[in-house]
Curated annotation (Swiss-Prot):
It catalyses: UTP + L-glutamine + ATP + H2O = CTP + L-glutamate + ADP + phosphate + 2 H(+); L-glutamine + H2O = L-glutamate + NH4(+); UTP + NH4(+) + ATP = CTP + ADP + phosphate + 2 H(+). GO terms for molecular function: ATP binding; CTP synthase activity; glutaminase activity; identical protein binding; metal ion binding. Mg(2+) binds at residues 71, 141. HAMAP family: PyrG. Keywords: ATP-binding, Glutamine amidotransferase, Ligase, Magnesium, Metal-binding, Nucleotide-binding, Pyrimidine biosynthesis. GO terms for cellular component: cytosol. This is CTP synthase. CTP binds at residues 13, 148-150, 188-193, 224. It comes from Enterococcus faecalis (strain ATCC 700802 / V583). UTP binds at residues 13, 188-193, 224. Allosterically activated by GTP, when glutamine is the substrate; GTP has no effect on the reaction when ammonia is the substrate. The allosteric effector GTP functions by stabilizing the protein conformation that binds the tetrahedral intermediate(s) formed during glutamine hydrolysis. Inhibited by the product CTP, via allosteric rather than competitive inhibition. Coiled coil: none annotated. Residues 1-267 are annotated as: Amidoligase domain.
Amino acid sequence: MTKYIFVTGGVVSSIGKGIVAASLGRLLKNRGLKVTIQKFDPYINVDPGTMSPYQHGEVFVTDDGAETDLDLGHYERFIDINLNKYSNVTTGKIYSEVLRKERKGEYLGATVQVIPHITNEIKEKIMRAAKMTDADVIITEVGGTVGDIESLPFLEALRQMKADMGSDNVMYIHTTLIPYLKAAGEMKTKPTQHSVKELRSLGIQPNILVVRTELPVSQNTKNKLAQFCDVNPEAVIESRDVETLYSIPLALQAQNMDQIVCDHLKLDAPAADMTEWRALEEKVLNLKKKTKIALVGKYVELPDAYISVVEALKHAGFDFDSDIEIDWVDSQELTAENVAERIGSADGILVPGGFGDRGIEGKIEAIRFARENDVPFLGICLGMQMACVEFGRNVVGLEDAGSAETNPDVTNNIIDLMADQENIENLGGTLRLGLYPCKLKKGTKTAAAYGNEDVVQERHRHRYEFNNKYRQLFEENGLVFSGVSPDNRLVEIVEIPEKQFFVACQFHPELISRPNRPQRLIKGFVGAALANKESK
């Protein structure tokens, strides 16, 4: 029978629930258990696809095309599993489904209410995710903090799960903050006590407390929390600030958190073999080189908007024994006059995805600088589209080359709306989303980066594409289309072969990178950037 673990948060948001959940998932997986994981987001949006990156951060796309919370990226990278549309559930999705059923008459004339209809739908989403993956354990994180009005239906559903499934099959983990008051010289447990009190008032008694802290938590403090929160002292787990996130699973294991979970859920599983993970941590903490990458974006004020890109760069750096120094460059501030001064010291230049016309010309200037000065370059999604626009303007000679997304009236629309997108009115969930195949051209830098495979699979999130009526003209001027869809209709990857590394892709390679298995195109870019640095 599937076991259910629910992770909630208290005191403050952004406390690291997602990393705790992902780390526990890794520990249980390394015990030989089949693990899946999901995130509940209490906002009313159906998904984050139309939300501003400034409000939500990155939108993480799964293989099946779901636009999801960035925590799913942490889950996939830590546990090394591919998630799906059932792994991220929002209030908007729940209410949409309940209202759809009501309109179809599936409730047989009943008055539709939060309890039982909304809570039943929430529970159905939990059990469906577990059933689809045949998981031994499903971990469900609830976004926000206990006390938020938006999360009440989710917490009520979690409370009901214990009665539905039995106490031996359900476990509650509560993550909180223990602030340190320098003036008093002590840690304060009262916020955690009140958070647990609030959770218990909703009918949920946590089995484990994970306390976020800057400093070590004394045994006396743990005993105090155990007494007031009614948990065992050994179930008060310290989550101290660490140098790298990859230390957290090992820190939790050192405190027997995974064993406590297995004991409570009556899971007979061998101890987790974390040898490979420990070697990864050792490598990460002792990198000998440093590579500087200029990340030229329009949302750089909020690094979470590019979190998978940053993590994928780090993964690639691990393979070269190199730390990655990110130079965050606001594309709105780049001009032809200051671009050399601003990004001239970078070992490599990366232009990531985005939407809209703000900051576009700055991205184009960064790409021009990379091409003209042979600085290793990687363009992703919008970065690929702007690389084609820059090539059209400054190499092909189409001075008014542009994108129909940012200028619908442009004459030379190098980037145009995909044919199957022309009559779509709704913005949400209508992009080209999910995993698609890409056929590689032999003898290219792209093919070499992928180990000379014929076809690769990558995740996409876009509405516009390269306009094929310009393909021959661009090829005649030196741009190589090194990756296309199997039917040859969609340009997936372009490159300039005589450069050290000038590659741009329509898909999002960062979404499938893993700490022990870096995405190959990004690894090729980082390798070229490091070689560029060493040749200076």
